[in-house]
Amino acid sequence: VGRGGGGGMTRRSICLHGPESPGKSTIGPRLAARFGTPLIGEYGRDYAEMHGTDFAMADLVSIAKGHDMLTREALARGRYPVILDTDPLMTAVWADMLFGWRDPWFDAWQGCADLYLLFDIDLPWVEDGTRMFGRTAERQRFFDLSRAELERRGVPWRLVSGVGEARWDSVMGVTG
């Protein structure tokens, strides 16, 4: 499931995309280790742990800009693919979830990854102090908005699903 993103091209970046608690932060380090390339961690999580989760739109723009800066720095080093634990597209979806609108900065942003891995919500939601959308309907809406953002942007993406090693196998089946 998904569009584009087949083999044959050198990918500069692979982005882990999707709502809260689907295993992105578990897969990210493992995928970076598999390729021997950098991992850009979830900038929004670091921001939330430092500043709290009572976000204004300006906070989300700051998160997106911070993540974009770290990504550009990693890409400039030339070790590919850089693994991104989310990016500004995901922060745009957060804006949609929290406020029902987004700052124009998000739609103007042009730094999309070469491949997006959309993580299914087939794992249990786990509270960690920064997560907000644990109810089934909220998780489904978050997933649907995440998928819609990828489709709206027309970027290559693939669905990642499965429990335990099956999830890793799903990732490896797409990324090699």
Question: PLM features: what roles do these ranges have?
Answer:
Residues 1-8:
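Short, Lys/Arg-enriched N-terminal segments with co-localized hydrophobic residues
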Residues 10-13:
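Pre-Walker A (Motif I) flank of P-loop NTPase domains
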Residues 16:
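Hydrophobic anchor at the beta1->P-loop junction of P-loop NTPases
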Residues 20:
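The conserved Walker
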Residues 24:
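Conserved lysine of the Walker
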Residues 29-72, 171:
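Conserved substrate/cofactor phosphate-moiety recognition/catalytic segment
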Residues 53-99:
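Conserved nucleotide-sensing/catalytic segment adjacent to the nucleotide-binding pocket
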Residues 99-172:
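A glycine- and Lys/Arg-enriched "phosphate-lid" helix/loop adjacent to the NTP-binding pocket
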